[in-house]
Amino acid sequence: MENLTCASSVEQDRFASLNFIISQSVDLITSFFTYMLSIIAIKMVLKQSIFETSTKILLFLNIFYANLYQIVYSIDVVVILYKHFFMQEEVCSLLILESSCAPFLETLIGTSSGMMYCQTGLLIERFCATFLKTYNGKKTIFVGSFIAIVVMISTTSTGKLVIWDDPLDDAVLACFIFPKKSKARSTIHFYISTVVSLFNLAASVALNKYNKTLEYQVRFKICARFHKRQVIESTETICFLNFTQFVFMFIYSSGNSTLKSIRDYIQPETYNFWVVWCYTVPFIALTFPLLLIYKVKSTRGIRAQKIVQISNTKQTQDEHINQMKVMWE
């Protein structure tokens, strides 16, 4: 067992690499910002948004997964930084047994996938809000809770599926690194994550366009128009979040897959330099509450601006009649 945890010369160089330490420090900083931004995002969603209850349930679940991921990942990063500064001479204490890392890795895979599943869940919830004739009260709570339960089950299962038959009889540099014998399955996981993220993005864009076309059909029905505006604002937010998630997930999956496929043809130093910057999951976790805050603020500002414009606009009776005629045409 002692031999397994002894670092090779390449692994020692990676531990000593300034690039590696900078990347880990940046990731650690993102975790602290994620915690603070999440508190602000939760308060804003509760007090300043017009999201349905079902949307709020899934947004909060996504925030939970983002923070849980950052907590577990930051523990791993702190261990790495400690070893870099205080244990570099202890060569046979640098690596960690894969079996010891399994609970951490399952949590990291599960929570990173959970953020993606939450986006899919939000998309399904938006379809319900769009196509169900009545979508309010207890129905929104039921839909949101049901989707959240499905997301949680899927999240718990994903981490176990990726490494379920791996003997975990080797050692790794850090717990966020996939076991060596799960290389093929990790690549499949990357591809599936990219496809799901792309699907989320495409479907949310299509749904957003559909909702905007329907808004004109109910422009003279106040309650119906408010509900449709509520649906549009929520869908626009989900679309915006899906786009950002897709960009980072594409960098993560395509970058890792490409580097793994050419690993035998490039220098270890080159591989180690780039692979740490392809690990963008911490940035997915960070940008979710950040962009959620931005969307709630910007949407609220637009609503306030429209109210001011309406209150400041003075029309004659003829102008009002002409405007009504144009709207009916």
From Swiss-Prot:
Subcellular location: Membrane
Protein name: Serpentine receptor class alpha-8
GO biological process, one term: detection of chemical stimulus involved in sensory perception
Annotated GO MF terms: G protein-coupled receptor activity; olfactory receptor activity
Listed GO CC annotations: membrane
Keyword Transcription: no
InterPro entries, alphabetized: 7TM_GPCR_serpentine_rcpt_Sra, Nematode_rcpt-like_serp_alpha
Organism whose genome encodes this protein: Caenorhabditis elegans
Keywords from the UniProt entry: Membrane, Transmembrane, Transmembrane helix
Keyword Transmembrane helix belongs to the record: yes
Alphabetical list of PANTHER family matching this protein: SERPENTINE RECEPTOR CLASS ALPHA-1-RELATED, SERPENTINE RECEPTOR CLASS ALPHA-10
Family according to the record: Belongs to the nematode receptor-like protein sra family.
Transmembrane segments annotated in the record for this chain: 26-46, 60-80, 141-161, 187-207, 231-251, 273-293
Membrane topology qualifier: Multi-pass membrane protein
Gene name as annotated: sra-8
Chief location category: membrane
